[in-house]
Amino acid sequence: MAFPRVRLVVTADDFGYCPRRDEGIVEAFLAGTVTSVSLLVNGTAAESAAELARRHSIPTGLHANLSEGRPVGPARHNASSLLSPEGFFLGKMGFREALAAGDVALPQVREELEAQLSRFRELLGRSPTHVDGHQHVHVLPGVCQVFAEALQAYGVRFTRLPAERGVGSCAWLEAPARAFACTVERDARAAIGPFSRHGLRWTDAFVGLSTCGRHMSAHRVLGSLARALEDIPAGHALTAELMAHPGYPSVPPAGGCGEGPDAFSCSWERLHELHVLTAPTLRAWLAQNGVQLCAIDDLDSKRPGEGVPL
């Protein structure tokens, strides 16, 4: 398949979740496929992950978390709309349900985001290269506005826009996963306005919703890129991001963000992604199709190209 000129960022999410996860992420980075990582500052291994990032000079951003584990901000010590009675975030769907019901106080969201940005600076000694959202919370209605405000206040320019073209037609996705991916895509498109108004940048194309876990293969990554880049004029230079979740499976009770590792973290699917990313097939296919791997901080500080279809 013939691509236009493409620079691809491959981001490994959930850095800091547990040492075994981090071991796999670093392995994929050293293999040359993963080019960027997103750190969970409330992860149980956040401090050791930060040391790994420094040791290996890994471009590192913040994986803003409002849905799993314990907070790092004022909510730790006070009653908060973000937390369950047990003091944990409400979960991927629980947070969405509370937000839709109007039960989430957005000023508390802003406080937690700023606390995580500050914690990142404490751990790494610098600002994040980018900020995205754990379980895509950053593009949710209302949250996307305070998220954009917080990033602007902290001088962060790059984020992720998880709008993957054609994800609704990916028949290999189970119905619940496909429905969730379509909802994320819809929310991402609605977040473009707030993100743009606050000067945020993101890649021209995004893939990863359709290639998560067991669904990742070199063939599907290339196919997702092809869909994302359809109708791009010849000679147009493009940027794209592949979201990935590589790592060795967590072994309970180690890992997580304060309440232990989740099922996906403990499954073989993380290891499957690691194998796909470190095998020579994917890198060879990308190179054959003119795709150049790069880090997020290698990209031009400009908004996505005009005329690029979303």
UniProtKB/Swiss-Prot annotation:
SUPFAM superfamilies: Glycoside hydrolase/deacetylase. Signal peptide: none annotated. Pfam families: YdjC. It comes from Mus musculus. Keywords: Carbohydrate metabolism, Hydrolase, Magnesium, Metal-binding. This is Carbohydrate deacetylase. Probably catalyzes the deacetylation of acetylated carbohydrates an important step in the degradation of oligosaccharides. Mg(2+) binds at residues 14, 134. Disulfide bonds: none annotated. The active site is at residue 13. The keyword NADP does not apply. Its cofactor is Mg(2+). GO terms for biological process: carbohydrate metabolic process. It comes from the Eukaryota. CDD domains: YdjC_like_2. Its EC number is 3.5.1.-.
